[in-house]
Swiss-Prot record:
SUPFAM superfamilies: 6-phosphogluconate dehydrogenase C-terminal domain-like, NAD(P)-binding Rossmann-fold domains. It comes from Escherichia coli (strain K12). The gene is yeiQ. This is Uncharacterized oxidoreductase YeiQ. Keywords: NAD, Oxidoreductase. The keyword Phosphoprotein does not apply.
Length: 488
């Protein structure tokens, strides 16, 4: 069967210009998902195209992804990224992946040993918030998580990311090998501290001495990642195959924009990512806040209210004058004033975001962005609301966004159609929705302390604002509620 590794590709396709034989598995990456393929791996590929070198990536997937890994091997670890701009496309073959391992195809033992090879300098992760096994209420390791329970009972055969990292670091220490940097690339706040808490929490349970060694010798840099990467669909794979003249089951489509801000704290070296435009900084937090509130906050706002209004894609929302105006107003009037970042033109940043959201070539589903809202709301909307509450400034669009989430998870859109709600707390949410009338819905959902904390549900101003926004949506529908809030 022909693959991208076995055919002559069209001239417009950008193929690797470096010697892939020189690559070693110096980066081991957990989670060969769409985002990683279009972001960290692609940026590493750019560095290799610019200056060569041996910074190859070994991709790891544990208990799923075996079919994708088999397909990747069949095409010599090459895959395609299609960058879709409003003005045209770029087709890129990424060659930075050197090998891949999967627990089903290979073995857990082989995976753990891979982390222990001397050349491994960085272990990076895109495993989503759930993969870190952290208790969201405390930020500490969740010792009630079934995988963590398993790993503490059988530490040499771990099933969780924290368990595998600790076992690998333990073995490296025993063998006299240098430790590696642990680099979280997930779109979660303070991701360096999240993975550090998970690893140290697991290590403390196993050996306080080992935990002390990890604390002293391993670094956990923070990162801010930004690129819109919709999930692959049959349609997107067919479109890419038309560019290539051959099928690539590992291919992914994305927008042209890409940004990666990384805390420059690596214990065993790193690729020269700055050559690929990566911003290496001392403190990621201001950048992270800017992105989470201005981009992700407005994305979630558009996802809930847009879906309720019958818009399937973010770009569809942006064709609507009210939604476009609301997104920009939310960014600049309600989110920007809460930020600490200096020397960034936030108006220019907002205008770029609006243009990215409006990109008609990207079919980014409102339903996809609406997933896992209980984990996203705290940093995307509630953090900004807390600042406004303290200052007594206006946050009426943020209130509408929170009420939009409540209406969305209630399971019916404005046309009366059922919504397929995907959320880690979906069982709990379903129970609260079923047990409350429309008038009681806000109070019922505010009882989710893991989302709203203890402070907001006890704040009468907050509760009143959300109830008013809820009533607007229930009475008039999401689109008219938006117009009423904007007073247009």
């Amino acid at each position: 069967m022909n693959t991208i590794a076995s055919v002559t590709l069209p001239h417009h396709v950008h193929a690797p210009r470096y010697d892939r034989q020189q690559l070693q598995s110096r980066i081991v990456h957990f989670g060969f998902g769409a985002f990683h393929r279009a972001h960290q791996a692609l940026l590493t590929d750019r560095v290799l195209n610019a200056q060569g070198g041996d910074w190859g990536i070994c991709e790891i997937s544990l208990f799923s992804g075996d079919q994708l890994m088999s397909q990747l091997r069949a095409q010599n670890h090459l895959y395609t990224v299609l960058e879709k701009g409003a003005d045209g496309n770029q087709v890129i073959i990424v060659g930075a992946v050197h090998e891949c391992l999967n627990a089903k195809l290979d073995s857990l033992a082989a995976i753990i040993e891979k982390f222990c090879e001397p050349q491994v300098a960085i272990v990076s992760l895109t495993i989503t918030e759930k993969g870190y096994c952290i208790d969201p209420a405390t930020g500490a390791l969740d010792t009630s998580n079934p995988r963590i329970i398993h790993d503490l009972q059988t530490p040499e055969e771990p099933h969780s990311a924290p368990g595998i990292l600790v076992e690998a670091l333990k073995r490296r220490r025993e063998r006299g090998l240098t430790p590696f940097t642990v680099l979280s690339c997930d779109n979660i706040p303070d991701n360096g501290h999240v993975v550090k808490n998970a690893v140290l929490g697991m290590a403390e349970k196993r050996s306080p001495e080992l935990a002390g060694w990890i604390k002293e010798h391993v670094s956990f840099p923070g990162t801010m990642v930004d690129r819109i990467v919709p999930a692959a669909t049959d349609e997107s794979l067919v479109e890419i195959s038309q560019h290539l003249g051959v099928n690539d089951p590992c291919a992914i489509s994305c927008e042209p924009f890409i940004q990666w801000v990384v805390e420059d704290n690596f214990v065993a070296g790193r690729p020269a990512w700055e050559v690929a435009g990566v911003q290496m900084v001392n403190d990621v937090l201001p950048w992270e806040e800017m992105k989470l509130r201005m981009l992700n906050g407005s994305h979630s706002f558009l996802a809930y209210l847009g879906y309720l209004s019958g818009f399937a894609h973010i770009s569809d929302c942006m064709q609507d004058r009210a939604f476009r105006h609301a997104a920009r107003t939310l960014m600049l009037d309600e989110q920007a004033p809460t930020l600490q970042i200096k020397d960034v033109d936030l108006t220019q940043y907002a205008d770029k975001l609006i243009a990215r959201f409006a990109n008609p070539a990207l079919k980014h589903k409102t339903w996809q962005i609406a997933m896992d809202g209980s984990q996203k709301l705290p940093q995307r909307m509630l953090a900004g609301i807390r600042i406004h509450q303290g200052r007594e400034t206006d946050w009426s669009l943020l209130a509408l966004g929170v009420a939009g989430w409540m209406r969305y998870v209630s399971g019916v859109d404005d046309a009366g159609n059922a919504i397929d709600v995907r959320d880690p707390l979906s069982d709990k949410i379903r129970e609260l929705v079923a047990g409350s009338s429309s008038e009681q819905r806000v109070t019922a959902l505010l009882s989710l302390r893991e989302v709203f904390g203890d402070d907001l549900p006890d704040n009468p101003h907050f509760v009143q604002a959300i109830e008013q926004a809820w009533q607007q949506i229930v009475q008039f529908g999401a689109h008219q509620a938006l117009l009423n809030t904007l007073k247009i």
